[in-house]
Amino acid sequence: MSALLFRGVTKAFVPGRPVLSGLSADVSTRDVTFVAGASGSGKSVLCRLAAGLLRPDAGEVELFGEPVHRLPERALRRLRQRAPYLVQGPALLDWRTLSENAALADRRASPERVQEALGRVGLRELGDRLPSQVGPGAKKRTAIARALVLAPEYLLMDEPTTGLDRVATAQVEEVLHGLKRSGLGALVVSHDYRLLTALADRVLVVAEGRNAFSGTPAEFLASSLPEVRALTAPYLETAADG
């Protein structure tokens, strides 16, 4: 069963200049699917369409069989509990502790449930600290814990390691590996190809508003398609030098 289905999706913010143009893709529930593409290619737009934060100008978006593009806001909120959307930044409230920030996902959540979510991201012992008292990696992991409080079936993640140093990136990567081992699928927008090769089951490349490539990470790195080579060549050169 598909978790996420795009059928002929078109989206423009300026008339006559579509960011996405007839894009179609079928994303499996259990897979960790990375969305790659050049800056401005529409990767994040795709993720926001999946979350129902944007509506397509044409085409259809389905999540768990529900027509995201036609749902009223109340139904969208229920759907987002099943597949929460994590923005690029941690989006924490500075005056709330990490535990309190995580609990904001569901005010009915028990303290035990919140602590379990924090434990899954390695922050059980830091729950009483404020965001200003922890580093960027812990803040990002708190945002992931906030999503886990909902007991989601799927995650929509926009650039989970952007702005993080190597140590913080490694911490987030460890959490994502743990979630994958637990069977939780995700759509991950990222330009971090090292993370992609370590974590992804599938890769979707967005170029010129369309689905330019879909395959495994190995197929992605080996592809000779110009749209793919433009992305992978710098990474492969750096990896060879390192």
Predicted features by range, described:
Residues 130-134, 138:
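Conserved ABC ATPase signature
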Residues 68-84, 181, 220-224:
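ABC ATPase NBD coupling module
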Residues 190-191:
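H-loop/switch region of ABC-family ATPase nucleotide-binding domains
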